[in-house]
């Protein structure tokens, strides 16, 4: 049986908020089976909870925000959400003493490290997966994203950037998902932005935490970071990381094939909401019998040990 997962102990870290540039303390707490993923702002009195839910994603301009019915929001959840998806964490309470998750190094790797340091705990309840039964596709101009039936979780992502620093041969990436593949191939890919955009946003009091420490920064010709790229195709790998986090907003690991061209947070979320609204296109399944398990989600690999 594939079991639900949480962490073994409370783990805490501090970082900087991408938007405010101020210190943020992040605390992750184990949660009981069927709790789901809950983001909590402890800077408010009383604290406000934001369950991970595709319908709560309302603002996708610079990052993924969860917004409740009172217009209270928590920002920059996508990289942590990707780490949870990558490690198959079903139940967790995530507390921050600010309006945003810290940006860390702009990737999911620091969150993976924290979660593995806390230890993965398997619970006694069967893990629920969202399995695609029909293909669902959404489009926005020439951009599109699709989920289709597949016995596992595969991703195929293409970006289309006309930039000297981004070679045409590095604009597509495919992955047959597993926790090990996510940690090694995806989690370290950082977010990226143009120096001119960062300077403009900061002049308006936005993106105050943006720096070379938490993003790949490019000008019109090259990558400006002294250490360069972590992967030759780090840009498209990060877009895949974003998609993994965006799709996990349904609270379940997905069994299906994800394919996208120039997609971003908004289109990824529209795809997820379109799938969920089409009830005949998916089902929630558990795997009591090991023979039925998709390879991608069999017993935790060495990376989780």
Curated annotation (Swiss-Prot):
The protein's annotated pathway: Glycolipid biosynthesis; lipid IV(A) biosynthesis; lipid IV(A) from (3R)-3-hydroxytetradecanoyl-[acyl-carrier-protein] and UDP-N-acetyl-alpha-D-glucosamine: step 2/6
Coiled coil: none
Active site: 265 (proton donor)
Chain segments annotated as transmembrane: none
Any one Pfam family match given in the protein's UniProt record, by short name: LpxC
Record InterPro entries: Ribosomal_Su5_D2-typ_SF, UDP-acyl_GlcNac_deAcase, UDP-acyl_GlcNac_deAcase_C, UDP-acyl_N-AcGlcN_deAcase_N
GO BP terms: lipid A biosynthetic process
Catalysed conversion reaction: a UDP-3-O-[(3R)-3-hydroxyacyl]-N-acetyl-alpha-D-glucosamine + H2O = a UDP-3-O-[(3R)-3-hydroxyacyl]-alpha-D-glucosamine + acetate
Needed cofactors: Zn(2+)
Lipid biosynthesis recorded as keyword: yes
Keywords per UniProt: Hydrolase, Lipid A biosynthesis, Lipid biosynthesis, Lipid metabolism, Metal-binding, Zinc
Binding positions for Zn(2+) per the UniProt entry: 79, 238, 242
Any single GO CC term annotated in Swiss-Prot or TrEMBL for this entry: membrane
Enzyme class per UniProt: hydrolase
GO molecular function: metal ion binding; UDP-3-O-acyl-N-acetylglucosamine deacetylase activity
EC number(s) on file: 3.5.1.108
SUPFAM superfamilies: Ribosomal protein S5 domain 2-like (SSF54211)
NCBIfam families given in the database record: lpxC
Classification via HAMAP family: LpxC
Protein role: Catalyzes the hydrolysis of UDP-3-O-myristoyl-N-acetylglucosamine to form UDP-3-O-myristoylglucosamine and acetate, the committed step in lipid A biosynthesis.
Protein family: Belongs to the LpxC family.
Name by which UniProt lists this protein: UDP-3-O-acyl-N-acetylglucosamine deacetylase
Organism the protein comes from: Edwardsiella ictaluri (strain 93-146)
